[in-house]
Amino acid sequence: MKSAVTLLVCVLALAPALPGARRKLSAQETEPAPSPVRGSLDDPEAYPRPTGHAVRADLPPVLDGHLDDPAWSAAPVFSDFVQSQPDPGALATERTEVRVVYDDEYLYVGAMLYDSHPGEYVVQSLERDFPSLSTRDADIFGISLDTFLDRQNSYLILINPYGAYRDGQTFDDSRNQDFGFDAPAEVRTAFRDDGWSVEVRIPWSGLRYVAAEGEQRWGLNFLRRVRRINEDSYWAPLERRDPLHRMSKAGTLDGLVDLPSAGAVWVKPYALTATEDGSLLGGRDTSADVGLDMKYGLTPGLTLDLTVNTDFSQVEVDQERVNLTRFPLFFPEQRDFFVENSGSFTFGDQTERNYRMGASLRDFSLFNSRAIGLLDGEPVPIVAGGRVSGRMGSWELGVLDMRTGREAGLPAENFALARVRKEVAPGSDVGAMFIDRSAVGGTASTDNRSYGVDANLSLWGPLRVNAYWAATDSRGATGDQTAARFGAAYRDRRWNVSALWRRIGD
């Protein structure tokens, strides 16, 4: 077994603001709140959370990266971005203007990113989903959308000046992120003499939301990163330690009226055929295969996924890595069936909660979806399966059942999983998970069961507590088969105190 105990103490001294070091911003619509005024404080978290307005476009904008369409000129401007670094609380040195419009098919986001040094952009790659787009190594415009206004989960898009972008889903107020998710967004950028501009078009069918009559309110935030001066600024101001997808501190988007249904059913059939011929084969051999994937919206928050004779041939291959340790390598999930709403199936160490504690999902995770349909990196046929994932009010639910076929050295197996979490207070939840893996039609050494309970609690503002206990029951296994953790952290602008105890069995 292994255990770890960490205690960190960090005291941050605040320097008083210099007279005249800040200037007040122009008025911007905000939710009712007393002072302070945006742009006048050193503490970004002390600002009132902003509210912006989206408008319906009679004529949708042309997606070319230029914001010269009538739809953009008629839309209110989201501006007055505030720095999180290097000068927290100060107005951004480079102005950013964002507009949001929509029609019956799409949501549009347009941004003008003014720059006093146009062309001096830092870009690491033009590749889609390149990791530097979510680090501090490139100029970025970022969008985070909380479509249920639960202040916990979001869709995330990060875009560089050359139009390369990375997208994903975030869960549990930034505790978990999944960049394997691909939003069906379209992005165009354009260069100008005074900066660069970007247009984003997202189909309603690619988002989950409540398609009800009347006006909706969503959580929203924007990020502008100017890499040459290491400046990050946000529309809804955040502390330096907070990411764009910290939705509990995001602003609000209103004006979304009578949105269309996001689409209840999505069907993806496939058919494959192959022919082999040659003298060594002794003739011609022809084979064929068919299968089906289906997605059905049970409710605005719950999704049913079904698959028959699953085909993962279109999935990007893993990057080759060399393992010089005795522990197996962790590879991220890239198969669409498992990616969407993957946060509903998460149990284990969580990166955000363990800030400066050296833990992540790679240290301990009770469920790894890559154990289904893969054996030593080689595909195992999936006969059929289904899952239900999403939210119902304050409950988060994940249920999965998969049947794999027989493969050399491995019998046919059935995988069943149930995961529930209950939000007991804003930012606090308790939950449980049960997993069963069993051979079909007999016994096998792979049979096991796993189960656990966990809690993530936000107490008295800066104090956070997270804990879990989990165990496995594997055929033929001996020794300690449990894992446990307790962590607590108190963090504000002056104090950062963290403690962690964790034990993982054999």
Predicted feature descriptions by range:
Residues T6-A17:
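Bacterial N-terminal signal peptides
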Residues A21-E423, S428-A432, S445:
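Structural preference for beta-rich elements and adjacent junctions enriched in aromatics
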Residues D194-S197, W204, D285-V315, L459-D506:
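Repeat-solenoid scaffold signature
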Residues Q314-Q334, N341-S342, T346-T351, F434-R449, ...:
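Outer-membrane beta-barrel translocator/channel fold
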